[in-house]
């Protein structure tokens, strides 16, 4: 029997994001960025090289949800930023031993949706942070608008490519 430090249940976007972190892809803040309050700005600067080390309770005390803290860096405006303007970057660190268990493969339940299915959000809101969907479109020769709704037939190959890139 194999033993692993972490078992991930499910290969959907959530499981893939956890897998990326366990594989060693960790965020950092870089360049010019601004948070809505000077107090949170100072907190972000303190943790810019390792945002995963911050105490989420400290954010909550300042009136900010932790998920919004990271979203403000990944998607600071409604439309997608060019990759060279991203202030959320990723560094490869040591991996943790992990195994993903899934019956659906990378993308999870998206593999079982109707072939005509579109998402309810733009492509760049469906991406997993360290592998931008715009980069996937370029690498696979897809001429797509990353601010438009993404089609299932683009999303599933993106999640599969994401898993392979881990």
Model-derived features: positions:
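Active-site catalytic pocket residues across diverse enzymes, especially alpha/beta-hydrolases
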Residues: 22-30, 114
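Glycine-rich active-site loop/strand segments that organize a redox cofactor
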Residues: 33-77, 91-158
